[in-house]
Amino acid sequence: MVGQRVLLLVAFLLSGVLLSEAAKILTISTLGGSHYLLLDRVSQILQEHGHNVTMLHQSGKFLIPDIKEEEKSYQVIRWFSPEDHQKRIKKHFDSYIETALDGRKESEALVKLMEIFGTQCSYLLSRKDIMDSLKNENYDLVFVEAFDFCSFLIAEKLVKPFVAILPTTFGSLDFGLPSPLSYVPVFPSLLTDHMDFWGRVKNFLMFFSFSRSQWDMQSTFDNTIKEHFPEGSRPVLSHLLLKAELWFVNSDFAFDFARPLLPNTVYIGGLMEKPIKPVPQDLDNFIANFGDAGFVLVAFGSMLNTHQSQEVLKKMHNAFAHLPQGVIWTCQSSHWPRDVHLATNVKIVDWLPQSDLLAHPSIRLFVTHGGQNSVMEAIRHGVPMVGLPVNGDQHGNMVRVVAKNYGVSIRLNQVTADTLTLTMKQVIEDKRYKSAVVAASVILHSQPLSPAQRLVGWIDHILQTGGATHLKPYAFQQPWHEQYLIDVFVFLLGLTLGTMWLCGKLLGVVARWLRGARKVKKT
């Protein structure tokens, strides 16, 4: 078995080395936070594989807060949106996060934020210097991100083939995958694949709500499309999603629910993983103080650190103070409540090497917001979780974590110090959580190809074959009435009704003939 895997790996990699040439690849990141980090990692991997990679990247402190900027192995084209655009984005993003933190419906705030992104995209497309430079480079392939609609429009403007990456689990975007509603949960439903009758009713109804939300978000770019594409050749965003040669998905079946896939869909969950390094000496010394009790890691992602309320910070601190473990917490010191004296077992830092700490043998628990990259890192290192999801895909991610027994989830707006303390102790002491997530880690590590190898292998494949037409079903080109057999249903229904009508007519004729025959007989 091991020999077969080695041969498969060697054959897969050699085919790329022998048949592919260095391609010019453009990656696009106009969003910040984890969206940027994922595209940065993709760019690094493709550059290391021998391709010539350039990232078109929107710079700004708001977009990449608390992220250590390192020298890039690939080329970067940086651009800045006007200051008034940046202020509007920050204002609407803050409003969106506050809406989520309050537990209110996020969709309206998200649509308003997308409208600002549409305006920003229009500005970028009007930058003749940037667009002409990109056209002159004549890239072989463009790499776009699912929620960055502007990146799809740039690829279309350049008239270049493109591949896309979905930074979340399936369901948060419709790009043509078959999704049976009986066991594939719709994105905002917070259901698992094990649905009872009422769960299936909810999932069915939420499908229409989700479709409407997608239409609302995509329509925020209508004005941008009208402004920058001539009438008669204006793209439709929902069609561009189907046009992608490949879809890479930042997930894995060790985490996600099993579901149907198409040939042009590739799982690369765990792509963010890098070689483990020793943790910084000051953190290692802090961990050593707690001996066998170990430590708890607390991290809430690149964007949420600056939006934690003072009240929530106090509740969390009170909960951590009651643990026998040490607690390493990424929390900006400038946001720390001045009236709170830090507990002796709690250490706050502005930045920490999350993956290295998750790999530390003394870690006992990961307290997280439930972001996709964070959850995948925890699973890879076999660390159980307590999730405090806030927005977007985080709630759905924690539904999967709970369903697979990798941890427990608490709504952030309902958390209390006592509840959080009891939940953390429960997950640390109940070894079933640790066993389940360690088993998931084995699933991730035992795959014949790593996420990075799958990424470069499939990129090389479509570069060599000139696209992925052979991987796309004809359904992408079918009218909806053909795809869902509406025409067949109407035909068969008409045929059935016509046959019934004809039979009825014939029976009527026979009945009248029989009645007439009886009358003749009587006379």
Curated annotation (Swiss-Prot):
Glycans are attached at N52. Its main location: membrane. One of its GO terms (cellular component) is UDP-N-acetylglucosamine transferase complex. Residues 1-22 form the signal peptide. It catalyses: glucuronate acceptor + UDP-alpha-D-glucuronate = acceptor beta-D-glucuronoside + UDP + H(+). PROSITE patterns: UDPGT. Residues 23-483 are extracellular. It is found in: Membrane. The chain crosses the membrane at residues 484-504. Pfam families: UDPGT. Belongs to the UDP-glycosyltransferase family. UDP-glucuronosyltransferases catalyze phase II biotransformation reactions in which lipophilic substrates are conjugated with glucuronic acid to increase water solubility and enhance excretion. They are of major importance in the conjugation and subsequent elimination of potentially toxic xenobiotics and endogenous compounds. This is UDP-glucuronosyltransferase 3A1.
